[in-house]
Amino acid sequence: SSLVSSVCAGELKKEGRQLKTFSFDFTDNENYFQSNSFQPSMDKPYAAKMASYLNSHHTYLECTNQTQADYLLRSVKAHDLPCMADIDSSLLYFCEQVSHTHKVVLTGECADEVFGGYPWFHRESMLDCGTFPWTPTLAPRKSLLNADFANTLRMEDYVKNAYDRAVSEVDILPMENETETSRRRIGYLSIRFFMQTLLNRMDRTSMNTGLEARVPFADKQLVSYVFNIPWEMKAKGGLVKNILRQSAVGLLPD
């Protein structure tokens, strides 16, 4: 996270110390990168700009396709169950590289869940999809299983029951309109399920390499406070994570 890095750099500067930062990429990513809803642009140019702005001791790490494959089995063992394949194996590799010189790091994980950065917070079709927005269909998962076996699992019923039970836990405010209520539910689902998955992934992966990854944006008090901030403040002017951006004025380059 650029904001986390900036705050840390400022504190270390008071002590005459230089912040050490890392960024990660995939080999030849500049040749094959395709913009998407989760990552509209490449990170590397912004990481370089931020490192220069903070005058941090910055290290670029790259992961090849072969390395991703080599770390797959170890990644599964770190999770004790099948996981997110190449995404997790590359994270394991990067954590291992960082662990050679550091034992504790701060990450920017969870900012999108807490401050509403994902597409499902902004697209009406995803707000009211009636299921977990990051998994609108089970077809890709069911395709991995024998059809008869998949049918006995009744996966759709399981997901629907889990979704209905989760949204019933959300406290609805009487002054909110239908759209605001939908965003409140989406926010709860993102924190209750999506964020928990990422936190577990980060914890298991980093600790497997002897690295402790701390997540400032997952601070309980911060999450509780931001959850109840009105959406028109969180995304003022339609700008994604606007309130977080405003809090960073003067701390980040324009």
Short names for language-model regions:
Residues 1-175, 182-186, 201-251:
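ATP-dependent adenylate-handling active sites, centered on carboxylate activation for C-N bond formation
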Residues 190-198:
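Core structural elements
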